[in-house]
Curated annotation (Swiss-Prot):
Pfam families xref list: IPPT (PF01715)
Keywords attached to this entry: ATP-binding, Magnesium, Nucleotide-binding, Transferase, tRNA processing
Source taxon at top rank: Bacteria
Top-level EC class: transferase
Residue numbers binding ATP: 9-16
Enzyme Commission numbers on file: 2.5.1.75
Function: Catalyzes the transfer of a dimethylallyl group onto the adenine at position 37 in tRNAs that read codons beginning with uridine, leading to the formation of N6-(dimethylallyl)adenosine (i(6)A).
SS bond partners: none
Protein name per Swiss-Prot or TrEMBL: tRNA dimethylallyltransferase
Subunit structure as annotated in this protein's UniProt entry: Monomer.
Length: 307
C-alpha cells in the first residue's frame, strides 16, 4: 500500500503551514483536499495557499476548475488517485491537506453512495416538491432515466428512497446503484490539528476580518459579474453571505458577522466529523508550536513501519 499523510482539522489551525513543513522534511507533494480551492480566481475566501507558500512545495488540485463548473467527490477521487500514484512513483510522499471530510473518506475508504453519502437539503427539498406537485411517478421516472438499476429496486410509490437516490446522484455525480467500498489501497496517517475552542473561534473571527481587509469583497463582486449565486462556486462560506448584500452597504457588517458565525459552525462540524470518522493523531500547534518536532518524529516512525 502507498503511504499517504492527511493533514486535517478545522479552519485557522495551521494546516497549510504544517503541510508545507512536512513536504520539505519528507520530500513530499501536497494535494489539496478542499472542495473550494479547486476554483480559479477565488483565492481569499477559500484561504488558498498563497503563491509564496505554493512556491515552497509542490501543490496539486488548486485552481483546476472554473467557477461555473461543479466539482463532485467522484471528480476529486478520480483526480487524486493518479496524483498519489505519480507522486509515489517519483519517490515522494503524498500529503493530502484540507477540510472536506467526505472527500478524504471517499479517497481513503472507497466511495460510499448509500446512507453514508453526503446530502444537500436544497436539492432534497426541490425533489420533494416535484413529488408533491407532479406526483411520485414523475420523480421515479427521472430516476429510471438516470439510474435504471436503482429504479428497479425502488417502488415508484416510495418517495423517500427515490428522493435519496436522485439526491446522491446530483451531489456526488455518481450512480446510486454504484455503491462501493472496496477498501483502502493506501496506508494513511491522519494528523489532526485543533486548539481550545475559544481560541479557535477567536482565530476564525480574525481570519474573516483579514479576508475582508485583503479584498474579499472584490472577489465576491468578480463572482457576481459571472453569475453570482447561480454558480457552483458561490455556495462557499464567505461568498454566499456577501453576494446578496453587495449593493446594500448598510448590511455588510451583518453579513460579515454571519460569515464568522457560519465559519465557526463549520469548524465545529469539521471537528465532529474527523473525530468520529478518522483515527487522527491530534496536536495543538496554536498553543504549542513546539509540538511540530513531535509531529515530525511521529511521521518518521510511521514511515519506517512496514505495511
Amino acid at each position: 500500500m502507498i503511504k499517504v499523510v492527511a493533514v486535517v482539522g478545522p479552519t485557522a489551525v495551521g494546516k497549510t503551514a504544517l503541510a508545507i513543513k512536512l513536504a520539505q522534511a519528507f520530500n513530499g507533494e501536497i494535494i489539496s483536499g478542499d472542495s473550494m480551492q479547486v476554483y480559479r480566481h477565488l483565492d481569499i475566501g477559500t484561504a488558498k495557499a498563497t503563491a509564496a507558500e505554493q512556491a515552497q512545495a509542490p501543490h496539486h488540485l488548486i485552481d483546476i476548475q472554473d467557477v461555473d463548473q461543479q466539482f463532485t467527490v467522484a471528480q476529486f477521487v478520480a483526480a487524486a488517485q493518479p496524483l498519489i500514484q505519480a507522486i509515489h512513483e517519483r519517490g515522494h510522499l503524498p500529503i493530502v491537506a484540507g477540510g472536506t471530510g467526505f472527500y478524504l473518506q471517499a479517497l481513503f475508504d472507497g466511495l460510499k453512495l448509500g446512507a453514508d453519502a453526503p446530502g444537500d437539503p436544497q436539492i432534497r427539498e426541490h425533489l420533494r416538491q416535484i413529488a408533491v406537485e407532479q406526483g411520485p411517478q414523475v420523480l421515479w421516472q427521472q430516476l429510471a432515466a438516470q439510474d435504471p438499476v436503482a429504479a428497479s429496486k425502488i417502488p415508484p410509490t416510495n418517495i423517500r428512497r427515490t428522493v435519496r437516490a436522485l439526491e446522491v446522484i446530483q451531489v456526488t455525480g455518481q450512480l446510486f446503484s454504484h455503491q462501493q467500498n472496496a477498501g483502502s489501497q493506501y496506508d494513511e496517517y491522519y494528523i489532526g490539528l485543533n486548539t481550545a475552542r475559544p481560541l479557535l473561534y477567536e482565530r476564525i473571527n480574525q481570519r474573516v476580518d483579514n479576508m475582508v481587509q485583503a479584498g474579499l469583497l472584490d472577489e465576491v463582486r468578480w463572482l457576481a459579474k459571472r453569475g453570482g449565486a447561480t454558480l457552483p462556486a458561490a455556495s462557499g462560506i464567505g461568498y454566499r453571505e456577501l453576494l446578496p448584500v453587495l449593493d446594500q452597504p448598510e448590511k455588510l457588517a451583518a453579513a460579515i458577522d454571519q460569515i464568522k458565525q457560519d465559519s465557526r459552525h463549520y469548524a465545529k462540524r469539521q471537528l465532529t466529523w474527523f473525530r468520529h470518522q478518522t483515527t487522527a493523531n491530534w496536536y495543538d500547534l496554536v498553543q504549542h508550536p513546539e509540538v511540530d518536532a513531535q509531529i515530525l518524529q511521529d511521521v518518521t516512525a510511521w514511515l519506517t513501519e512496514k505495511n
